[in-house]
Amino acid sequence: LPTAVAGTIYNNTSEMNVKALGTSGKGAVYAINAYGYKHTVLTTKAQLISALQSGKPVFAAVGPGIFIGPNATHAIILSGYSNGKTKAMDPASSYTTGKWYDINTIWNQRSTDPYDTSIGGAFVQIG
């Protein structure tokens, strides 16, 4: 459950943003590792596509665009790759979740916020 993941981050790190809801890239990586998964920060679009083609889910910190309005960032999970598109799971919206999106659009809307990218990038392969 998302609440259990949030609790893991909140109880074990200082990376939980309780004022604006959410966590940093460091918090996400902590949770991935705490649940027994390995992680790889993806720094190029080619790496992102390769991870998705190999069947690995990807944690994605995104900026303004499809998933979040101006002056904010948001986290989604990407999975699968077909015909230049990937499926997004959005914990904040039943409208945007479960749909396929152009990989170029996702890449171009990646977060550049240091809170999200202090781990080296905005995308993290899980597993």
Regions found by a protein language model. Name each.
Residues N11-N12, N17, N33, N71, ...:
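Detector for Asparagine
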Residues T13, I32-G36, L52, K56, ...:
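Sec/Tat-exported extracytoplasmic proteins
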Residues K26-A28, Y37, Q47-I49, F67, ...:
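Generic structural signal for short, flexible, solvent-exposed coil/loop and linker residues
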Residues Y81-G127:
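Noncatalytic regulatory segments and standalone regulatory/sensor domains
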